[in-house]
Amino acid sequence: MYGASLAWAADQYPDVKFIAVDVTQGDIGTDAIPANCYCITFKEEQAGYLAGYAIVKDGKTKLGFLGGMAVPAVIRYGYGYVQGADAAAQELGTNIDINYFYGGQFYGDANITSRMEGWLNKSLH
């Protein structure tokens, strides 16, 4: 989300060193990461995997994933969540039901609230 701004700032301030957290070369939109930038990325899929695995091991079988925007970090987390949940379900010999949705924003609104309430009501019946 901030890649273009980082590329601009790195060009404007070549003597300044920038550290960009959760930014990749693809986010920057240039052929290479500027020499005065250091990009650090998390392995979101690993955190997501552990979350999905743990919730199924805790006995939950009706799950939901709501990602804000479908940006690479959120997508990786979501995929990890599904993979972890599936791995735990296979170990337990059980079936799971996962609702999966991207809200297209990083804030709530009436439409997202309604969808989440629908998921909750579906899981209670």
Regions found by a protein language model. Give the residues of each.
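A residue-level marker of the well-folded mature domains of exported/periplasmic proteins
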Residues: 1-125
